[in-house]
Amino acid sequence: MRIAVVLFDGAEELDWAGPWEVLAAWAQGWPGDGVEIYTVADATEVRCAKGLRVLADHTWETAPAPDLVVWPGGSGTLAQRDDAATLQRIRALRDGGALMTSVCTGSLVYAAAGLLRDRPATTWWGRIDTLAELDPTIDVRPDARFVDSGEVVTAAGVSAGIDMALHLVARLHSVERAREVRRYIQYDPEPPV
């Protein structure tokens, strides 16, 4: 299974790094499961929302065809929602059979591409109304950490991507494997505030 984590200028760091940590821990910790994970972007270097510079493993031209796509949110998604090439790429990935997942405002790009039509979905709490405005057929779930609607999985804001990624491990392999990965990354949140 090939997992593509999408990067772009303005991508929210934890939106992609949280799922990356979960899914890469799975790939490296259990190599027999046959998971390959890589980053992909329009350009080799991107500057994320909080200023972090990251080098992508692949551009879209060199990336292997993914079985699963993680599309983060962040300020960069604002331009993506109106970019015909980005929206077509998303549709082509879906049409190619990839399981399409998003974190935070990545779901707004999916909505603009038509992926969320007549589906339940969620996004970052600050853009719930925008999700509903982009496509009134979406069954918006404002209180969900993530929503699995089969071919598309959307997560709420930022840290919810970690929960979604653990769900993906359970869905694609087993609950036991997801628990092993969760233990490995020592993810057992008890916020102090």
Residues covered by each model-derived region:
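Extended, subdomain-level signal for the structured scaffold at the beginning of enzyme domains
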Residues: M1-M100, S107-A112, D129-D143, I162-V193
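Structural detector of well-ordered beta-strand residues that form the stable sheet scaffold
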Residues: M100-T101, T122, R141, V153
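A short glycine-threonine-serine/GTX helix/turn-capping micro-motif
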Residues: E151-G157
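Conserved alpha/beta-hydrolase "nucleophile elbow" surrounding the catalytic nucleophile
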Residues: V103, V158
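Small/polar loops that bind or transfer phosphate-bearing groups
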Residues: L7, T123, A156
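Generic beta-strand structural signal
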Residues: V147-D148
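Short, glycine-/small-residue-rich phosphate/pyrophosphate-handling segment
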Residues: L115-E133
